[in-house]
Amino acid sequence: MNNTNDLYNRWLAQPDLDDAVKAELVSIAGDADAVTDRFYRDLEFGTGGLRGVIGAGTNRMNLYTVRKATQGLADYLNASGLPKKVAIAHDSRHNGALFARETARVLAANGITACMYPRLEPTPALSWAVRYLGCGAGVCVTASHNPAKYNGYKVYGADGCQITLEAAEKILAAIEKIDCFDDVRLADFDAAAAAGRIVTIDEKCLDDFVQAVYDQRVGDGAGIDALKLVYTPLNGTGLECVKKLLKKLGVTHVTVVPEQEKPDGDFPTCPYPNPEIREAMQKGLELCDKVRPDLLLGTDPDCDRCGTAVPDGKGGYRLITGNEMGIILLDYICRTRLAQGTMPADPVAVTTIVSTDMAAPVAKKYGVELRRTLTGFKFIGEQIGKLEAEGRPERYIFGFEESYGYLSGGHVRDKDAVNATLLVCEAAAWYAQQGKTLLDAIEALYRKFGYYRNALCSFAFEGESGMHTMQELMKKLRANAPEDIAGYKVESVVDYDTDGTGLPRANVLEYHLDGGHKLMVRPSGTEPKIKVYLSAVGDSEAAADAVNAALAKAAADMMKA
């Protein structure tokens, strides 16, 4: 049965259908486009799990799609020989607690112990719990920094990383055999809890997570107690763990943005709660004008990304980009560990193919091996796992990606904004001891290594036709590689969807241009959009910015269907 109207009618005819789902289905009766959009496909399950708009239908996040995915996960676990235990967390999004509870019910009905945090917690705390509790998998109900209408379902492996492509394919194969109404086993929550099949994660687990982050300190902490901070959790999960960490560090001058302090799935002050964008940080910046802190820190709803602003020397505050902070922290960690004699032999730093090329000369200066992975922090986590398997986990010193994700230890296997808070505070305090800010730090690095400018252009393609348009655009780009982009000769093209790159195949095109500039095209794995990453380098800020502006215009032209 694949006719959208048939699916719609079958859903509507279900006895005991969830009230909210039923009301939505009734409201779209006779609206062919609305019915088609909800039923023309199943939500795609991949290495990022599920992510979609909350609502009714097979192409939405709801009780039934979550239960179906969990039944597939349970079937996979029961056939795999992995521990029959799963850690579960959720963030502040709508239906987060409900979806986490339904996940636990399905797992319990399949003989798998569900370990649930008693309240909303950060994604890195979920990665920690998987390893800490010896679980076979983990589930985090989150849509990260997407708008309020979204929710998601991230699956983690026993190593605390988001699942590999191989695991995702096996889970998907199991999911595809399941009818969301007829084939899902479902336990009574209270009965399963009484039987020990659903358990609450002990507070010690979270306390030990915060301690593990604290143990990632790089320097001696001199001057850190003098730091003055403004912090915003963007109505998400970060407040508890970040405040606990700051207290351990001795950072007591902390002002929390009041409108964004409490969890709120509507994200009323910022429709797109992403610390990468100014709009999300605007309330924090306004508070900075009154409080005049040394740092503004913002974490996204599931507290795995961290944004920063610092005084600009002109009475205002400047946002530091994810690439800039990655370079600042890489340089700080390397110079500090060398000075203190704590740098391991054969140190390794890891970044992604869409992150700044500036990492290469910085790593080279300090004798650090730089590894590049595909987009997604799970690939950085995999590199930590490889070093661990070799018996040399201490070689890993830092990993970052351009989208504001950082990690300096192996305590978790995903980006960690609590860890980022520690590193940013340490680096800011170290520079403050010299009368400098983090802005001074990145400017000095630009002067030394060149002015690297990176930008991200996103092009949305909504609905069923949008997915087709995205596929056709990528096909066209592969068939007809441009000879030049923005007037810069295309010197080479790397298609990551082929063998020979040294990385797993991925739907990414990379154009290397004359002058050391670069443009990369990548369809998002979680949203209906194509992302174009721009990279320019020049001997001045103005020169690099001019190239980036030209590349941005060229990218827009390339995306026209």
Where in this protein do the model-derived segments appear?
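An N-terminal, well-structured beta->alpha segment
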Residues: 2-103, 110, 193, 198-226, ...
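Gly/Ser/Thr-enriched, mixed-charge loops and adjacent short helices
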Residues: 16, 34-39, 43, 151-280, ...
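Short acidic, glycine/serine/threonine-rich loops at helix termini
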Residues: 97-102, 127-131, 149-155, 176, ...
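Phosphate-binding and adjacent anionic-ligand microenvironments
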Residues: 289, 293-295, 316-318, 336-522, ...
